[in-house]
Amino acid sequence: SGSITKSRDVRTQAVFSLRGKPLNSYGLSKSVVYENEEFNCLQAALNIEDGLDELRYNKVIIATDADVDGMHIRLLMLTFFLQFFPDLVKKGHVYILQTPLFRVKNKKEIRYCYSEEERLQAIEDLKPNPEITRFKGLGEISPDEFKGFIGKGIRLDQVCLRKEDAVSDLLGFYMGKNTMERQNFIINNLVVEEDVE
């Protein structure tokens, strides 16, 4: 979280840094919120112990690396919020920060790309021989660069629940026993990306 902490607007943005992967709270009682130091501190930082009326921040943004470990951390954080503070999600306060996957540059211009399509377009626009950097984690992005990703041009994906989505069913599907239904879902929705150096 070093780059985010150094580049944030201290008047409007706060950073809560996790130490490693959070606990999988699926199926646990709310006592874990008080017993687990990370969860207890997060609850206190957001001021949501007694509900959302005193919520300190309108947007709770989950920022992780864009790799498998980062996706797992996102899932664990969403599990925590859905398990114990579902209204935080239902009322539209939880977001995922999009961070660039690539930097494509030539001597005149730098483009940050959030998808393979954007990378290919940038290579085409900045040819003949642009330099391409693949970001593997948030720590590889300097604070000066990061400032542009969390300022006015911030790209966020809001975490939404449809009215017909039952929280217990969602958590059971994604975090419960490894069923054939979930295995088939993963296989059918798996995206394999090339590692571009």
Residue map of PLM features:
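Conserved phosphate-chemistry cores used by DNA topoisomerases
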Residues: 1-197
